[in-house]
Amino acid sequence: MRKLFLDAFGEKKLDKPPVWIMRQAGRYLPEYRAVRAKFDNFMDMCRNADACCEVALHPLQRYDLDAAIVFSDILTIPEAMGMDLKFIKGTGPVFSEPIQSQKDLDKLKSIEDSIGSLDYVYNAVKTTSSAINVPLIGFTGSPWTLAAYMIEGSGSKQFNKLRKMMYANPQLMHSLLQRLADITIIYLLEQVKAGASSVMIFDTWGGILPLEHYKNFSLKYMEYIAKNVKQKINIPIVFFTKGGSNFFEEIKDKSCDGVGVDWSVTLKQARHRIGVGKVLQGNFDPAFLYGSKQSIRETVRANIEFIQSDKLNNYIVNLGHGIYPDIDPDSVRVMIDAIREFSA
């Protein structure tokens, strides 16, 4: 197995950084769209281990990447807890009966029953890990991010229902977050048992919170998960809070091994605020792939020059969030080739 990705979490400074891409198995690839067309709905595809493996392999077959990520969705846990999940074209994920009260919370399945409904994810991990020669990344949504969808019923611009519960009924909010955290620990451990070499916690909506509430309602539960997972098996764990650059000083002392960085700050700024010891992952603006070949190469060169100038810390080159569906696959090749060229 090529271990450059895992080596980034070691103490030795690497000669070149590993690279992978958030949502690297996705709609920007025509081969992905061909597989997706075979299924009536997205979750049916996620439940098919062979399909998950096939689409996870697509980017590895096209590009020189150092890691794969299991093909799944962050909302598998809420669905396993008994919530009715549908993916609606033009809207995205929708829960028909959002969590609004303690009564709604009481309707959810137990942790044991919920975990038993997620075997299809572990099967996808096992099938994919046996088919690749690079590390496989397992993942989950943070409890706060899962709760955001469970309470709102869908994505939102302002998350008023979510934030209302946080302020008006914090006890209920913490009850939901704790249950999600307890399930997530088992969920990640099962992914590791099935073949994941590291795990990532996507805190997509943590960035909407004020600092103190981020600490109490998001970071607290990510840290709880990381500590409990590491008590069982010491694997690399990456925290990624989208829009979370204001929280780096809080994250730097937590149990994660790496921190995802979006494009709102430079890697130099992120390193200054996080300090030494954590791997930084990121942080290209996904939209930079709309640019010309020359502009892509220039942007890559600047980041690689900084990475190589830091003699103490390792970096994982990635986008600052998921790749956009309408990105030209050839632009991704330009990016990766430039990363390899300027890292040589």
Swiss-Prot record:
Site (Transition state stabilizer) location in chain: D73
Keywords from the named record: Cytoplasm, Decarboxylase, Lyase, Porphyrin biosynthesis
GO biological process: protoporphyrinogen IX biosynthetic process
EC numbers for this chain: 4.1.1.37
InterPro entries hit by this protein: UROD/MetE-like_sf, Uroporphyrinogen_deCO2ase_HemE, Uroporphyrinogen_deCOase
Catalytic activity from the UniProt record: uroporphyrinogen III + 4 H(+) = coproporphyrinogen III + 4 CO2
Positions that bind substrate: R23, Q24, A25, G26, R27, D73, Y149, T204, H321
Pathway, per record: Porphyrin-containing compound metabolism; protoporphyrin-IX biosynthesis; coproporphyrinogen-III from 5-aminolevulinate: step 4/4
GO MF annotation: an example: uroporphyrinogen decarboxylase activity
Signal peptide: none
UniProt subcellular location: Cytoplasm
Quaternary structure (record): Homodimer.
Function of the protein: Catalyzes the decarboxylation of four acetate groups of uroporphyrinogen-III to yield coproporphyrinogen-III.
Family: Belongs to the uroporphyrinogen decarboxylase family.
Name of the featured protein: Uroporphyrinogen decarboxylase
Species: Francisella tularensis subsp. tularensis (strain SCHU S4 / Schu 4)
